[in-house]
C-alpha cells in the first residue's frame, strides 16, 4: 500500500499570501489528485492528474510534482480557500488518501 504524507498538517495564511501544501508518497505514483473539503460538506475534486484544475476551481490554484513528491499551491490566498485539502492516488487495486492539510485564514 502506498502511503501519502501531507505537510503541514495544519497551517494559516493571510489574505494574498502564497500557500504550498506538499504530499509525499512512500513509493512512486504515476498520478496524483487533490480534493477540497469545507465544513459539513463532502470533499470536492479540486486538482486531477497532478496539475489539471477541476471545473470551477480558480486559476490561483496550481498543482505540480512527479514520482514521490507533489504539491498544491495557492498563488494568493482568499478567504474562501480556507478548507481541508487531501491528496489521493490510485495504484491498482488500492486508492489511498493523505491525512489532510487544514488551511485556515489568518486574521
Curated annotation (Swiss-Prot):
Transmembrane segments: none annotated. Keywords: Adaptive immunity, Disulfide bond, Immunity, Immunoglobulin. Residues 24-33 are annotated as: Complementarity-determining-1. One of its GO terms (cellular component) is immunoglobulin complex. Residues 1-23 are annotated as: Framework-1. Residues 34-48 are annotated as: Framework-2. Signal peptide: none annotated. Disulfide bonds join 23-87. InterPro entries: Ig-like_dom, Ig-like_dom_sf, Ig-like_fold, Ig_sub, Ig_V-set, IgV_Light_Chain. It comes from the Eukaryota. Residues 97-106 are annotated as: Framework-4. Residues 88-96 are annotated as: Complementarity-determining-3. Residues 56-87 are annotated as: Framework-3. Coiled coil: none annotated. One of its GO terms (biological process) is adaptive immune response. Residues 49-55 are annotated as: Complementarity-determining-2. This chain was isolated from a myeloma protein that bind galactan. This is Ig kappa chain V-VI region J539. It comes from Mus musculus. The lineage of its organism: Eukaryota, Metazoa, Chordata, Craniata, Vertebrata.
Amino acid at each position: 500500500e502506498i502511503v501519502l504524507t501531507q505537510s503541514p498538517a495544519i497551517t494559516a495564511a493571510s489574505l494574498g499570501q502564497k500557500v504550498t501544501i506538499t504530499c509525499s508518497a512512500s513509493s512512486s505514483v504515476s498520478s496524483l489528485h487533490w480534493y477540497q473539503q469545507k465544513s459539513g460538506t463532502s470533499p470536492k475534486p479540486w486538482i486531477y492528474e497532478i496539475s489539471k484544475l477541476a471545473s470551477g476551481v480558480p486559476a490561483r490554484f496550481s498543482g505540480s510534482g512527479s514520482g514521490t513528491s507533489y504539491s498544491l499551491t495557492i498563488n494568493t490566498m482568499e478567504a474562501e480557500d480556507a478548507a481541508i485539502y487531501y491528496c489521493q492516488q490510485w495504484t491498482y487495486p488500492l486508492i489511498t488518501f493523505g491525512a489532510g492539510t487544514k488551511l485556515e485564514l489568518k486574521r
